[in-house]
Design a protein with these regions (language model features):
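Acidic, Ser/Pro/Thr-rich low-complexity regulatory regions
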Residues: 1-224
Length: 224
């Protein structure tokens, strides 16, 4: 079975995340092509030489884009940490009456606005395969199966052992890059399960239960 990424899941939404979306869209396409290439090779549709040449091309392009993605993530996380610390300092300065209520509100709005712009940028970058949150378990399962297939069939198809290990290493790195998405999926699923229990014990009315459940299920349809 061919593993598919969710590269067409969601169109770019607004100029604020345009650059981040471009990076992730390119990465998603390359991952998709690379995974399809692996499957074609395992099905006997390519010689080892052609496979290794094209795979290496995708690999180098993915590496360059991933370096850019990780640099952007580090920059945004650093800035968000700085802004959060500024908020805490601002709150303390206001509590001891060093600054007025008006000045506190003005600065807080300014900081909140910047944080509000950085959070969606970071969320986009943390999904390099542009896959729906709800599709994460199936995608992860398919990648794990692909790893097993490469280990088993690669040597049989005359792929050098060092290249087999290289492909497996890259697939494992992709799984590692998905850890934030896995945690998001598990958090949402846990919230849905808790909601069902609250409904069953009578804490929530049927309509309220359905409203909250639909809200959580919509989150599983998002790519960030």
């Amino acid at each position: 079975e061919t593993v598919q990424t969710g590269e067409q899941t969601k169109e770019a939404t607004g100029e604020d995340i345009a650059e981040e979306r471009r990076v992730v869209e390119q990465l998603s396409k390359l991952y998709n092509w690379q995974i399809k290439l692996i499957n074609l090779f395992l099905e006997g549709e390519s010689t080892p030489e052609i496979f290794m040449e094209i795979y290496s091309d995708y690999e180098s392009r993915i590496k360059a884009l991933n370096e850019k993605r990780l640099e952007m993530i580090a920059r945004y996380e650093s800035r968000m940490k700085e802004l959060t610390q500024r908020l805490e300092t601002l709150k303390l300065r206001h509590e001891v009456s060093e600054i007025s209520q008006r000045e506190y509100i003005r600065q807080k709005i300014e900081i909140d606005n910047e944080l509000g712009k950085l959070k969606p940028k970071l969320a986009v970058l943390q999904n390099p395969i542009e896959i729906k949150i709800g599709d994460i378990p199936k995608f992860r399962e398919d990648v794990l199966k692909l790893i097993d297939d490469v280990k088993a069939k690669g040597p049989q198809l005359k792929l050098p052992q060092d290249f087999v290990e290289r492909v497996v290493g890259n697939l494992n790195a992709l799984l590692d890059a998905m850890q934030d998405l896995v945690r998001q999926y598990e958090r949402i699923r846990t919230e849905i399960l808790k909601l069902e229990v609250r409904y069953k014990v009578g804490e929530l009315a049927h309509e309220e239960y359905l409203t909250q459940k639909r809200r959580l299920e919509r989150q599983l349809e998002l790519t960030f």
